[in-house]
């Protein structure tokens, strides 16, 4: 599924793929289809899982492939730490295979992949907040741990997503920080 173009895939195909690959009966909240050809080739799908209770396993699984051949789960050097809660599949034929993990940590190419994934996650969240704030609010309790941890771990991610972090106001309604501060600025 990840090798297809995103507009060739249906929601039902994404959900079925998620159930089969991750053996999870709960539907994911939403997903991001990665499809990049330049400056490196990267395809994949990242799912935001639904976390129902504090007892749910919040450990994700990111399966790394090279030319559709499975390589490993949860390569921390490729996936930013705060996104290790996600579930997904990433296929990167350009990734060097015959290197140690310590070499991967210092590889500029691997860092670019990690930054690209972080940017795509931030773009998806910002886009959702701007175009479908109701859905964003509905998902907030499940996605806020990802976002808050990401803000602590990644300064660029924090700078990008900062205005889209939600807080409850005194009326128990979700507001972004700029929305909460707007009445104060008017005074």
At which residue positions do the language-model features occur?
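Conserved GHKL (Bergerat-fold) ATPase module
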Residues: 1-187
